[in-house]
Amino acid sequence: MTVLAPPRPRSLLDFQDWLPERLSALLDNADTMHQVLERPVRKVPALQGLTVCTAFFENSTRTRISFELAARRMSADVISFAAGASSLSKGESLRDTVEVLSAYKVDAFVVRHPASGAAHLIARYSGKPVINAGDGRRAHPTQALLDAYTIRQEYGSLAGKKVAIIGDIRHSRVARSNAELLPKLGAEVVLAGPATLLPADLAALPGVTVTTDPKEAVHGAHAVMALRLQQERMNAGYLASLQEYVERYQVNEALLREAESGAIVLHPGPLNRDLEISSEVADGPQSRILKQVENGQAVRMSVLYHLLVGRD
């Protein structure tokens, strides 16, 4: 009996339907895209004739610019949709907005939205490939992919590597996406933060451990990721005080000494310097924070190519 392979995912909303082999292929292809970005002329015609709409219903600097550059590097046309200047402010529904944009013959959507699950709705309404650029607390898959790519770039593989993620896990779509992705690629993930900022459901994911002890999390880690305290998403009562948080959970030189020698430091940005991460570590020799930003473009080029052009 012939066993058919699962179909290629049409969208990148999260990692639920993505097999490890496809994820590895995305990262392999990012190497090719990285080579394109090293050329004197950093452009290829791979998406010529296609239109990508970046629909951001929430503020973004790195992700929006990275996606728009990625699409243009591959010769796609880009429609940049800003929710604040749209008919949404006049009461138009999300569904109607998406259907109007689809009528302009858009080939794919890149979506950021403050509501968890919004990217899934837009995929349903548009009938087009959708890349989730962050929806509420739920998922930010391309950030996790570029984090994985940065770690792989350093070590050659994620297999057997320990990744510690420290901070506001509860409100972080980045933490959730990394917790889903990295074990699929062979890494061990340890999430650490105050008990009030640790959602219990993540402990049930394969390859993921949850602790309130940052030293335990960082011990023997090959990569240490600091997360921003998302105070804009918090109500009162999550933290006793910021000072107490800094003393216990800040990723600084003292905490980093618990990690593997030469462990790399990551942060998805934006940084709150000297809150979740010390300036000495953020700017130090083990930091790969700017490398993450650089790698984001190659990874997002790979994702766009995979969804719009790639063939099995």
From Swiss-Prot:
<dbReference type="GO" id="GO:0016597">
    <property type="term" value="F:amino acid binding"/>
</dbReference>
<dbReference type="GO" id="GO:0044205">
    <property type="term" value="P:'de novo' UMP biosynthetic process"/>
</dbReference>
<feature type="binding site">
    <location>
        <position position="140"/>
    </location>
    <ligand>
        <name>carbamoyl phosphate</name>
    </ligand>
</feature>
<feature type="binding site">
    <location>
        <position position="269"/>
    </location>
    <ligand>
        <name>carbamoyl phosphate</name>
    </ligand>
</feature>
<comment type="function">
    <text>Catalyzes the condensation of carbamoyl phosphate and aspartate to form carbamoyl aspartate and inorganic phosphate, the committed step in the de novo pyrimidine nucleotide biosynthesis pathway.</text>
</comment>
<comment type="similarity">
    <text>Belongs to the aspartate/ornithine carbamoyltransferase superfamily. ATCase family.</text>
</comment>
<feature type="binding site">
    <location>
        <position position="62"/>
    </location>
    <ligand>
        <name>carbamoyl phosphate</name>
    </ligand>
</feature>
<feature type="binding site">
    <location>
        <position position="112"/>
    </location>
    <ligand>
        <name>carbamoyl phosphate</name>
    </ligand>
</feature>
<comment type="subunit">
    <text>Heterododecamer (2C3:3R2) of six catalytic PyrB chains organized as two trimers (C3), and six regulatory PyrI chains organized as three dimers (R2).</text>
</comment>
<dbReference type="GO" id="GO:0005829">
    <property type="term" value="C:cytosol"/>
</dbReference>
<feature type="binding site">
    <location>
        <position position="63"/>
    </location>
    <ligand>
        <name>carbamoyl phosphate</name>
    </ligand>
</feature>
<dbReference type="GO" id="GO:0006520">
    <property type="term" value="P:amino acid metabolic process"/>
</dbReference>
<dbReference type="InterPro" id="IPR002082">
    <property type="entry name" value="Asp_carbamoyltransf"/>
</dbReference>
<protein>
    <recommendedName>
        <fullName>Aspartate carbamoyltransferase catalytic subunit</fullName>
        <ecNumber>2.1.3.2</ecNumber>
    </recommendedName>
</protein>
<dbReference type="Pfam" id="PF02729">
    <property type="entry name" value="OTCace_N"/>
</dbReference>
<feature type="binding site">
    <location>
        <position position="173"/>
    </location>
    <ligand>
        <name>L-aspartate</name>
    </ligand>
</feature>
<feature type="binding site">
    <location>
        <position position="228"/>
    </location>
    <ligand>
        <name>L-aspartate</name>
    </ligand>
</feature>
<dbReference type="InterPro" id="IPR006130">
    <property type="entry name" value="Asp/Orn_carbamoylTrfase"/>
</dbReference>
<dbReference type="Pfam" id="PF00185">
    <property type="entry name" value="OTCace"/>
</dbReference>
<comment type="pathway">
    <text>Pyrimidine metabolism; UMP biosynthesis via de novo pathway; (S)-dihydroorotate from bicarbonate: step 2/3.</text>
</comment>
<dbReference type="GO" id="GO:0006207">
    <property type="term" value="P:'de novo' pyrimidine nucleobase biosynthetic process"/>
</dbReference>
<feature type="binding site">
    <location>
        <position position="143"/>
    </location>
    <ligand>
        <name>carbamoyl phosphate</name>
    </ligand>
</feature>
<dbReference type="InterPro" id="IPR006131">
    <property type="entry name" value="Asp_carbamoyltransf_Asp/Orn-bd"/>
</dbReference>
<keyword id="KW-0665">Pyrimidine biosynthesis</keyword>
<feature type="binding site">
    <location>
        <position position="270"/>
    </location>
    <ligand>
        <name>carbamoyl phosphate</name>
    </ligand>
</feature>
<dbReference type="InterPro" id="IPR036901">
    <property type="entry name" value="Asp/Orn_carbamoylTrfase_sf"/>
</dbReference>
<feature type="binding site">
    <location>
        <position position="90"/>
    </location>
    <ligand>
        <name>L-aspartate</name>
    </ligand>
</feature>
<dbReference type="GO" id="GO:0004070">
    <property type="term" value="F:aspartate carbamoyltransferase activity"/>
</dbReference>
<keyword id="KW-0808">Transferase</keyword>
<dbReference type="InterPro" id="IPR006132">
    <property type="entry name" value="Asp/Orn_carbamoyltranf_P-bd"/>
</dbReference>
